[in-house]
Amino acid sequence: MAGGPRRGGRRRKKVCYFTANGITHIDYKDTDLLKRFISERGKILPRRVTGTSAKYQRMLTTAIKRARHMALLPYVKEEN
């Protein structure tokens, strides 16, 4: 059968990177920071994966899209 009973204990609660480090503004020119929140294929990682709060996820998405538009980040990464 598909699935089955789940095993394991409690999952560790993800903490927002920006709240924990006191970052209030996400700059689109800071590509090293933005790359942490992009998958290896170039997609923006969701909140459930990164643990980012809703406020900072919106700011992060805007910054990544700006950086892509300014050609600082790629829209997609090539498959090897």
From Swiss-Prot:
It holds the Pfam family Ribosomal_S18. Coiled coil: none annotated. It comes from the Bacteria. Keywords: Ribonucleoprotein, Ribosomal protein, RNA-binding, rRNA-binding. Binds as a heterodimer with protein bS6 to the central domain of the 16S rRNA, where it helps stabilize the platform of the 30S subunit. Belongs to the bacterial ribosomal protein bS18 family. This is Small ribosomal subunit protein bS18.
